[in-house]
């Protein structure tokens, strides 16, 4: 039996220049590495990300405490363990070594989700190597999925950034393009890349060259003030690229970031110094705005249209548009089984955004995915705005047969490493895979 011989942790930098944790797990089969991402617009119900809070280092964002936790607490408990026992390893860390809980389950507030996840992903890679399987096939076996005919996901490219990801006036955080009409993942990525470059030219011609600077996820951040302006840019770019009908549009409102708790309203003007009362909308009024966009633009997916606790608005919106439009829960669900169960009961959305670092272990992420899929939801695997060169989520989305992934724009290496890995996987599978395409919500 292959066993864990050593675990090493270190502090590295993510794509925003902030510290994050990297973990190496060593077995007789080699050294297996994982780096943990970090979000900017984080849901309040996410598992705890442990930061040092030492103002003398990295403005308090260091992760040396998490590194020491791996070295001093996790490593001694896992030495000699079988890396193929993914659930056993994860639950040892989550339930026994940490054990902290809140109303939504294990909170990881002792060890930190970042420390636990780094070890969890590295062990997953070690387990795959021990079994002699590609990582995506090993993940499929962990989830009880078939490995006969794999599904390649539709990539959702974030090409215009707003919200907390950019310095413009846009309240909504992401505007995305999805090549559902492509024949395979390689062509889908080509469609996305070409449209991205056409979008750059459209923006340059309208707003000047300096408007083509990019945000945290590689999308452009032009100084547009309204969502309609951003959506019109996408329509123009898709047409210029020649992919009308083949590329659809999605957006992530990340509405928790502009929800005003004291007013019980959504402030679409929250990034502007001059306040406009007409931009402060109730959930009902904002729902009407969204529904107007759905009628006007080829939008197939909407993420976090309302605040993470506004289940009523989520439910009303999903009831009205959910048959034709994907309604994704991110901050409202945070990849948490108990939050998903509440949303299922309330019929609040119809798709889970799967972020492994929100919940903090591979096992819990797989369980969340399986619950969503069993309940008839879609599942979209997602990166974070603070990313690394780790391409784990590319293997995860294929292994779990989710049919859709978002990993930023076709720009910046920490985004492209996921898309490039998907092309490699498709190449290795050959005829043994299909592209999700129009069936991305419920891939066959």
UniProtKB/Swiss-Prot annotation:
- Which PROSITE patterns does the UniProt entry name for this protein? ENOLASE (PS00164)
Q: Which GO terms describe its cellular component?
A: phosphopyruvate hydratase complex
Q: How does the cofactor bind to this protein, according to its record?
A: Mg(2+) is required for catalysis and for stabilizing the dimer.
The record ties this protein, via InterPro entries, to: Enolase (IPR000941), Enolase-like_C_sf (IPR036849), Enolase-like_N (IPR029017), Enolase_C (IPR020810), Enolase_CS (IPR020809), Enolase_N (IPR020811)
Question: Which reaction is the catalytic activity of this chain?
Answer: (2R)-2-phosphoglycerate = phosphoenolpyruvate + H2O
Which amino acids does the record list as binding substrate? 165, 174, 303, 330, 382-385, 406
The record's section on Pfam families has:
Enolase_C, Enolase_N
Q: Which cofactor does it need?
A: Mg(2+)
Name its pathway: Carbohydrate degradation; glycolysis; pyruvate from D-glyceraldehyde 3-phosphate: step 4/5
UniProt xrefs under HAMAP family: Enolase
Q: Remarks, anything else?
A: While ENO1 and ENO2 display similar K(m) values, the pure tachyzoite-specific enzyme (ENO2) has a threefold specific activity at V(max) compared with that of the bradyzoite-specific enolase (ENO1).
Task: Give the record's subunit note.
Answer: Homodimer.
Q: What is this protein called?
A: Enolase 1
| Species of provenance | Toxoplasma gondii
Lineage, highest ranks first: Eukaryota, Sar, Alveolata, Apicomplexa, Conoidasida
Gene encoding it? ENO1
